[in-house]
Amino acid sequence: MKVENYTRVKLLTDSYLQDGVGIGSIGYVIKICPSEKYEVEFSDKNGVAIAQIVVGPDEIVIEEKSNK
């Protein structure tokens, strides 16, 4: 999986429910951290940030925008 800054990703875990995001939440990579970690920002439908968390590569998958 090739993840770069501004890559759209989907969260695969409920480990961050306390931060307001769970499985299926969509976010964008804003920083690539050491040890294959990624800082991801999740926002609501109005673009207001909900959470900014550091996740591992096994906790996200690249999410292509749907045409819906």
Name these PLM-found stretches.
Residues V3-K68:
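Basic/aromatic-rich interaction segments and small domains that mediate binding to polyanionic partners
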